[in-house]
Amino acid sequence: MKVTLIAILTCAAVLVLHTTAAEELEAESQLVEVGMPDTELAAVDEERFFECSVSCEIEKEGNKDCKKKKCKGGWKCKFNMCVKV
């Protein structure tokens, strides 16, 4: 009787540990997926910075006031940079 009880408790403990480990792996995989767009956004930010500053520099060479290039998607050109509004 004691052996059966020990076997049942052991199986229950293994099941709990296995479930916990599976949940941790799933959470880690979701964190990795969430982190991926950040690197893509950084590349977009660099492109916006470059486009905005180049646009202003070209207009300054023509002895005109810098009409800053419009940055789209909640961004605006300020100090030759696209900044988040």
From Swiss-Prot:
Any one GO molecular-function label of the UniProt entry: toxin activity
Signal peptide: 1-22
Covalent S-S links between cysteines: C52-C66, C56-C77, C71-C82
Key words of the record: Disulfide bond, Neurotoxin, Postsynaptic neurotoxin, Secreted, Signal, Toxin
GO annotations of cellular component type: extracellular region; host cell postsynaptic membrane
Tissue distribution: Expressed by the venom gland.
Sequence similarity: Belongs to the neurotoxin 12 (Hwtx-2) family. 02 (Hwtx-2) subfamily.
Name the record gives this protein: U4-theraphotoxin-Hhn1m
